[in-house]
Amino acid sequence: MNTQIIAIANQKGGVGKTTTCANLGIGLAQAGKKVLLIDGDPQGSLTISLGNPRPDKLPFTLSDAMGRILMDEPLRPGEGILHHPEGVDLMPADIQLSGMEVSLVNAMSRETILRQYLDTLKGQYSHILIDCQPSLGMLTVNALAAANRVIIPVQAEYLPAKGLEQLLQTVNKVKRQINPKLQIDGILLTMVDNRTNFAKEIAALLRDTYGSKIKVFKTEISPSVKAKEASADGKSIYAHDPKGKVAEGYKNLTQEVMKLEKPVSYTHLTLPTT
């Protein structure tokens, strides 16, 4: 099985990474894909949003899995992986992952520990999605080193859009030095309130600035209280508000992402020179 590994990345918090990871993952599962979600954030936001309110009480999390790889200790197949009722699997995270990030600093092959772990799972899944932490630290570098694709959620505001350059430089550096297979699938505009001229202007600015170098998804995700309610209930937006705008948006995004998996679609997705 040719596993697609997609990192959902942006060093800015609050841009919809976790919501995108959960709902894109479940959207892919609804389309018949076998999906594993990886919570790559010590805050455990993805873990919590999928119905595990106390990540610290879980017996096995991503920090344990990476620790086994780091210490060259054996892993049982599927150890610690949880199953969500909406058809996706989850490798959860808790605050111990922040300690793992510190441990990685002086480790051999420190950028590839997550990749080595995912190599043990690849044949079991068609898609692995990684919810990256909101920083450009060693955990995010590990995610980019493990992935072959990146989706960048960006809130339709000036400052988050401005911060894109730093992330693109990091992606470019990882591609150049560690992972030549890494490609940017596209920029996803989130929390776009098309009732305001400001949001429309930011969306247009992003498309003008990056559209010739990087795909900007046609799909735009609207702001929604329902999405927050869904996370609080441990459900996807499809289960919580199936006929709402956000559910429609993530269904459309899922279709766009699957279309990119045809070989011809990578020809124009080149990284900008930095």
Question: What residue spans do the PLM features occupy?
Answer:
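A short, hydrophobic C-terminal helix/tail in secreted or cell-surface proteins
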Residues: T270-T274
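P-loop NTP-binding core
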Residues: M1-L269
